[in-house]
């Protein structure tokens, strides 16, 4: 992890297209501005985690609807034990 120190008004660059600027500091909160192309998603971590969770649930539901989680054993063999 790269650790940087920036003052209000200073900017750091991520690649050629993303800039992060410190807008203000108030108590233990830091306001930052992110300037990135529209095709690059920028989320707070808790929002990103919720999106990932929702995608996982949605994917699992699609697999269930398609029968992907059906038992892999032969029904006749299973019930004739």
UniProtKB/Swiss-Prot annotation:
Annotated InterPro entries: CsrA, CsrA_sf
The protein's superkingdom reads Bacteria
Assembly: Homodimer; the beta-strands of each monomer intercalate to form a hydrophobic core, while the alpha-helices form wings that extend away from the core.
Q: Which GO terms describe its molecular function?
A: mRNA 5'-UTR binding
Question: What keywords tag this UniProt record?
Answer: Activator, Cytoplasm, Repressor, RNA-binding, Translation regulation
One GO biological process term is: positive regulation of translational initiation
Predominant subcellular localization, coarse grouping: cytoplasm
Alphabetical GO CC annotations of the entry are: cytosol
Annotated region (Disordered), positions in chain: 60-81
Pfam families to which the protein is assigned, alphabetical:
CsrA
Alphabetized Gene3D superfamilies for the sequence: Translational regulator CsrA
Tell me the SUPFAM superfamilies matching this sequence: CsrA-like
Name of the protein in its database record: Translational regulator CsrA
Subcellular locations according to the entry: Cytoplasm
The UniProt family comment states: Belongs to the CsrA/RsmA family.
Which organism's genome codes for this protein?
Psychrobacter cryohalolentis (strain ATCC BAA-1226 / DSM 17306 / VKM B-2378 / K5)
Explain the purpose of this protein.
Answer: A key translational regulator that binds mRNA to regulate translation initiation and/or mRNA stability. Mediates global changes in gene expression, shifting from rapid growth to stress survival by linking envelope stress, the stringent response and the catabolite repression systems. Usually binds in the 5'-UTR; binding at or near the Shine-Dalgarno sequence prevents ribosome-binding, repressing translation, binding elsewhere in the 5'-UTR can activate translation and/or stabilize the mRNA. Its function is antagonized by small RNA(s).
